């Protein structure tokens, strides 16, 4: 019976991808280099240096709604980045993104701190389908001032939706989304992500960890 359970478990593990949030969190918990690659790709930069990452970070409230972040990363500038993987469209609603952003903000200042010292925050939803249906790799959400020709408000709160269905391998986001949807590490393009997937799926230590 134990052997049958083990076989069933291994079959389930074989099917998991980084697009599955629990597997994503397990693969990238406290992993600097792969998270740095993901953030630089999504933010279209090459200079983000991640200082620390943590998976399944819970923001609790005794009387109000709490949230749990798939991956929370902090970079060298102190910016806080929340990476969420959402396969169901319901889980990536625009008001949920707003709530995530506000819950992160409330943890960033101590009593007496100046509001202007708030660091920039990024809430990133990687969705399995194209959330907004325009075929774009990324959708950037920013507050703007309507009466000033949509000039940027510049409050430092950034929300980005990543189209998990975008698979153009000529585009950095397309390559990342290809890897996020791979079940086999050998098919993945980025060695940093492939290494983490390979460890969890193909080594005894990784399988035990899962």
What is the predicted function of each stretch?
Residues 1-16, 22, 74-77, 81-86, ...:
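Short, charged alpha-helical interaction segments and adjacent helix-coil junctions
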Residues 2-4, 32-37, 44-46, 74-76, ...:
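Short acidic/polar alpha-helix capping motifs at helix-coil junctions
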Residues 15, 26, 56-57, 94-95:
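Extended, gly/pro-poor, charged amphipathic helical "stalk/hinge" elements that serve as dimerization
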Residues 17-52:
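Acidic-basic catalytic patches of nuclease active cores, encompassing PD-(D/E)XK
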Residues 39, 69-73, 81-87, 124:
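Conserved catalytic cores of phosphodiester-cleaving nucleases, focusing on short active-site segments
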Residues 52-76:
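Active-site metal-binding core of divalent-cation-utilizing nuclease and nuclease-like domains
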Residues 66, 78-80, 92:
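Short, mixed charged/polar active-site loops
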Residues 90-196, 200:
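Mixed-charge intrinsically disordered linker/loop segments at interdomain junctions
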């Amino acid at each position: 019976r134990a052997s049958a359970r083990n076989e069933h478990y291994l079959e389930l593990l074989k099917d998991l991808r980084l697009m599955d949030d629990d597997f994503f969190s397990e693969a990238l918990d406290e992993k600097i280099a792969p998270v740095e690659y993901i953030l630089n790709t999504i933010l279209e930069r090459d200079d983000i240096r991640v200082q620390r990452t943590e998976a399944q970070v819970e923001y609790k409230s005794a009387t109000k709604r709490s949230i749990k972040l798939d991956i929370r990363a902090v970079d060298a500038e102190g910016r806080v980045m929340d990476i969420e993987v959402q396969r169901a469209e319901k889980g990536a609603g625009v008001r949920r993104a707003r709530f995530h952003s506000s819950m992160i903000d409330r943890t960033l200042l101590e009593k007496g701190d100046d509001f202007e010292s708030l660091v920039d925050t990024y809430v990133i939803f990687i969705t399995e389908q194209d959330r907004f249906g325009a075929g774009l790799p990324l959708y950037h959400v920013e507050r703007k001032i309507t009466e000033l020709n949509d000039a940027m408000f510049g409050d430092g709160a950034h929300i980005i939706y990543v189209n998990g269905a975008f698979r153009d391998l000529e585009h950095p986001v397309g390559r990342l989304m290809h890897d996020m949807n791979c079940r086999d590490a050998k098919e993945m393009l980025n060695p940093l992500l492939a290494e983490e997937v390979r460890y969890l799926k193909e080594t005894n230590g990784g399988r035990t960890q899962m």
